[in-house]
């Protein structure tokens, strides 16, 4: 990576930077860095030092920090030295204070022994213990100032003083070496050939550049020029008169091409210039095409600044904001959108801005109100751009559903019914089906939010089926379909669609979408009873959500983790995750509350379970999804708490829902609830027949447990043992400790000596979440490099985890992993 020319205070130019991430998505570049470091460490350990990391451009910083977070067994150590503002979340930090006065005095005595005592004391005071300042401030003083015979320079902040010190050394250079130094400062990437070509066109030579090197201001190594310190570069650039600066950038524009040419042309343009702005816009579009959103955003912003037309400038600012969102820079996108909003007047640009601003607010964890904003922005463009209007409505529906704003969901459904047909009419053949399905699904979601499950569910089922038959081309549409699949209990469809989207996201480096798809993967794994795999998926999704600033997604992931902990009876973990979910969007908060209710139910705290679940289903913080998914637990808690009348409504809701979605496991659970309120066993028997069709092993085991309890109370002890044994085996496989305890107690009550808790640990339980992911992929036949690419790790880390996993699993070779697929 190269140092960025930008310094504090906006005093340096908008010049090209050699961005490590310019050619690809920042996370894929980070993976490439990790792989490179891993390969370098194959023969011996590597120490990677980054001094002044705060001077790195954002793309380079992202890639390096991404790699650092994933270091494990590579034999690589990375150390960043930076100011506090450097964002290195997830890495251990060691704050460094300035040198104490005694150490500072010793350093000055060694390096600047001729300083008068008052001068030395002032330097110690003004340096604030900064070693760079202690070394450079004396070098900027003339002999009179060093001895105290001349008045000292005016006091400045440390950075300003050091910058001034370097500036004084720049000023001492003759004119042509100073010009050559300025060209190197403006060039920004350190390419010697480019610097020399531009310098030559201005009358400077390689010898002039050598003179700057002899002055200790830069180094020339091979074909590369490097400044002694970023502040030297800033000083050299800032000391250029305006006319020189414009000439330097003009010369550099002639000596370069692509993005750098466009940026140098921009820096050489003191006034708006449409030709230059258009050049920048073309470069930005090319950057978007090669998945470099950060670069594209910067180029679009520069293009906006140089646009003579306000409308063109606004359009380019909107593109800059959109690219910032794509690159995961939420705060930057919000700031750009605010600037664009000051000048946007037409409905189309305002609608595009609405998408950016709503996305930014949602990613910040504040979705409330964004749905109305999106829907309001869709209405004015419905006639002129129904496709964009429908996209806004899809986003609005998702945000409203997450925020628990049922009224907005219904409003969006009404708008979708009006706009959908027009949107279909503007599509080519293939997209028409996708658009029609999505519009219908929005209508269906609105009906469900209004309580009309029977007519809403078929519309949702249609969009899921359409997506499975012919995967949608739009990323927004693909992600939208995942929610209906889960809502309908179509676990196989949800798993299939989410796995395909996750694979596509890994292949294309769409890291921002991965937390969403991995969340759905985890939910389907929980439904299938694969808690270990779900925990590993959640760990990866959580890390990616944090890296991309998706606060709301972290809350949703926490709700799933709370559910797993509830099933397993881990109260501390469940409460921790439920609390995190409670701080997120309404949907996550409600799911976290349902997990707490399940925890209480499993631990036999029926009154508390009833209170928590009743609040989730009908309290002020209710959510439509919780009304359905809490019903079975609420009914069971009510019956056990001696309040069967409070189970009636829950049973009715669940029965209606199960009939609509027509999934065997859901119908079985509805029958189980009905059985709790019925004197006979017909409902239990019917439920067991439906469970035979598969799906949701935890729910089947719960039905078996309740059926066994009923049979035992009916004095049919021998009959009771069959479902109770099956329930116990399932609960033990799931790690559902409190539920297994109940099944064991019921078996003992039938007169059977129930087996003690199996002490036999599943070998997979010995693995860490990451080891489990790697073992599963290796068992499926993936190579180490394939696994590394999928999980954004180095292949050496994959090798290390497999090496650690083999003895834990009791295997000696990769071939033996097949049984763990």
Model-derived segments and their meaning:
Residues 265, 287, 307, 324, ...:
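Residue at a conserved register position within TPR or TPR-like alpha-solenoid repeats
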Residues 207-208, 219-227, 243-332, 336, ...:
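Extended alpha-helical scaffolding segments used for macromolecular assembly and cargo binding
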Residues 290, 327, 364, 403, ...:
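Structural motif corresponding to the intra-repeat A-B loop/turn of tetratricopeptide repeats
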Residues 103-308, 312, 419, 602, ...:
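Short secondary-structure boundary elements
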């Amino acid at each position: 990576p190269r140092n960025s020319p930008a310094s504090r205070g906006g005093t340096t130019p908008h010049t090209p930077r050699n961005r490590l991430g310019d050619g690809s998505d920042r996370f894929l570049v980070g993976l490439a860095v990790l792989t490179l470091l891993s390969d370098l460490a194959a023969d011996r350990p590597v120490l990677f030092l980054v001094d002044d990391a705060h001077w790195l451009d954002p793309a380079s910083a992202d890639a390096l920090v991404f790699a650092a977070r994933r270091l494990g067994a590579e034999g690589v150590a990375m150390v960043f030295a930076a100011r506090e503002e450097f964002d290195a979340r997830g890495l251990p930090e060691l704050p460094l204070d300035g040198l104490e006065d005694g150490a500072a005095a010793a350093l000055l005595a060694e390096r600047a022994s001729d300083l008068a005592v008052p001068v030395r004391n002032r330097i110690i005071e003004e340096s604030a213990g900064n070693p760079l300042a202690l070394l450079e401030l004396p070098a900027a003083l003339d002999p009179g100032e060093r001895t105290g015979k001349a008045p000292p320079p005016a006091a400045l902040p440390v950075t300003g003083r050091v910058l001034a010190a370097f500036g004084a050394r720049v000023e001492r250079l003759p004119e042509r070496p100073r010009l050559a130094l300025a060209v190197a400062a403006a060039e920004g990437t350190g390419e010697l050939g480019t610097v020399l070509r531009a310098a030559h066109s201005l009358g400077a030579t390689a010898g002039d550049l050598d003179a700057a090197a002899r002055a200790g201001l830069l180094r020339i190594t091979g074909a590369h020029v490097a400044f002694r310190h970023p502040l030297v570069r800033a000083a050299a650039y800032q000391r250029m008169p305006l006319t020189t600066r414009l000439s330097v950038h003009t010369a550099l524009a002639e000596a370069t091409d692509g993005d750098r040419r466009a940026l140098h042309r921009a820096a050489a343009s003191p006034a708006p210039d449409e030709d230059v702005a258009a050049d920048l816009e073309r470069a930005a579009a090319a950057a978007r095409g090669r998945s470099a959103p950060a670069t594209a955003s910067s180029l679009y912003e520069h293009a906006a600044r140089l646009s003579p037309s306000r409308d063109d400038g606004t359009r380019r600012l909107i593109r800059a904001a959109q690219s910032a969102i794509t690159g995961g820079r939420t705060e930057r996108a919000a700031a750009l959108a605010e600037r664009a909003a000051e000048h946007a007047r037409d409905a189309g640009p305002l609608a595009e801005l609405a998408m950016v601003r709503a996305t930014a607010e949602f990613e910040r964890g504040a979705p409330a109100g964004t749905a109305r904003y999106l829907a309001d922005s869709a209405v004015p463009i419905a006639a002129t751009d129904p496709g964009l209007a429908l996209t806004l409505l899809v986003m609005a529906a998702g945000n409203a559903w997450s925020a628990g704003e049922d009224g907005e969901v219904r409003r969006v459904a009404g708008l979708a019914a009006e706009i959908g047909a027009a949107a279909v009419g503007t599509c080519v053949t293939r997209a028409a089906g996708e658009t029609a399905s999505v519009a219908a699904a929005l209508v269906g979601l609105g009906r469900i939010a209004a309580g009309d499950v029977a007519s809403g569910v078929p519309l949702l089922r249609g969009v899921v089926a359409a997506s499975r038959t012919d995967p949608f081309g739009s990323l927004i549409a693909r992600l939208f379909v995942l929610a209906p699949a889960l809502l309908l209990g179509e676990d196989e469809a949800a798993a299939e669609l989410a796995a395909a989207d996750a694979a596509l996201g890994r292949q294309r480096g769409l890291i921002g979408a991965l937390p969403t798809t991995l969340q759905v993967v985890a939910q389907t794994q929980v439904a299938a009873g694969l808690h270990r795999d779900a925990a590993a998926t959640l760990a990866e999704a959580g890390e990616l959500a944090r890296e991309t600033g998706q606060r709301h997604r972290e809350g949703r992931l926490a709700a799933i983790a709370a559910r797993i902990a509830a099933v397993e009876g881990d109260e501390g973990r469940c409460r921790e995750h439920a609390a995190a979910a409670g701080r997120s969007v309404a949907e996550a908060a409600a799911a976290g509350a349902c997990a707490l209710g399940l925890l209480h139910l499993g631990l036999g705290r029926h009154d508390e379970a009833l209170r928590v679940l009743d609040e989730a289903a009908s309290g002020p913080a209710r959510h439509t999804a919780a009304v359905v998914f809490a019903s079975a637990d609420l009914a069971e808690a009510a019956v056990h708490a001696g309040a069967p009348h409070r189970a009636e409504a829950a049973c009715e809701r669940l029965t209606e829902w199960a009939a609509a979605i027509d999934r065997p496991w859901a119908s079985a659970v509805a029958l189980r609830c009905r059985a709790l309120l019925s004197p006979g066993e017909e409902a239990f028997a019917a439920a067991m027949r439906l469970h035979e069709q598969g799906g949701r092993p935890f729910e089947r085991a719960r039905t078996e447990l309740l059926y066994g309890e009923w049979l035992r109370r009916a004095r049919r002890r021998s009959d009771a043992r069959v479902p109770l044994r099956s329930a116990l085996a399932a609960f033990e496989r799931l790690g559902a400790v409190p539920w297994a305890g109940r099944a064991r107690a019921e078996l003992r009550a039938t007169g059977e000596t129930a087996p003690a808790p199996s002490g036999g640990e599943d070998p997979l339980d010995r693995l860490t979440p990451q080891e489990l992911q790697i073992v599963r992929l290796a068992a499926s036949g993936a190579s180490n490099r394939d696994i590394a690419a999928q999980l954004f790790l180095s292949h050496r880390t994959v090798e290390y985890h497999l090496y650690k996993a083999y003895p834990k699993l009791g295997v000696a070779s990769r071939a033996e992993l097949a049984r763990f697929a």
